[in-house]
Amino acid sequence: MMKCLLIATGERVPTWVAQGFAEYHKRLSYWLPLELVEIEPSLRGKNHDPQQAIEDEGRRVMAALPKQPYAVTLDVKGKSLNSEQLAKRMEHWRGLGRNLVFLIGGPEGHSQEVLNISNERWSLGPLTLPHMLVRLIVVEQLYRAATILTNHPYHRGK
């Protein structure tokens, strides 16, 4: 079975985000075991260099990657998918036989190094979302995609 990681920059999330993530993580584990890897964010303050923070976080993300992963980067410039399209992508990813990694960056996004290793870029749409909330949305959408593939009634669709 392939290994699936969600590598997210940021360690302290609100309790309600952690609880929501835990619920969908538990539900998803039946179809797709997912491991959350939290990356320590770079310090930010009024004198911080955002580019340096991006590069530092990028190095930590790269160090956390398994060998030869299929990397799906959450990126505002990525491709937006509806739930059915995501289910088809999930089916494709499962058939690759490679470790699957979803990458969530920090407040300023991903380093160029991380973007360069990405096999796909996925956008959650044009809304600006708190990066801590993205992990909850991603795990819920992966669960929804799994239920679509198995005709589970969670996704009522069209």
Swiss-Prot record:
The keyword rRNA processing applies. One of its GO terms (cellular component) is cytoplasm. Keywords: Cytoplasm, Methyltransferase, rRNA processing, S-adenosyl-L-methionine, Transferase. Its EC number is 2.1.1.177. Disulfide bonds: none annotated. It catalyses: pseudouridine(1915) in 23S rRNA + S-adenosyl-L-methionine = N(3)-methylpseudouridine(1915) in 23S rRNA + S-adenosyl-L-homocysteine + H(+). It holds the Pfam family SPOUT_MTase. S-adenosyl-L-methionine binds at residues 74, 105, 124-129. InterPro entries: Alpha/beta_knot_MTases, RlmH-like, tRNA_m1G_MTases_N. Transmembrane segments: none annotated. Homodimer. Specifically methylates the pseudouridine at position 1915 (m3Psi1915) in 23S rRNA. Belongs to the RNA methyltransferase RlmH family. This is Ribosomal RNA large subunit methyltransferase H. The gene is rlmH.
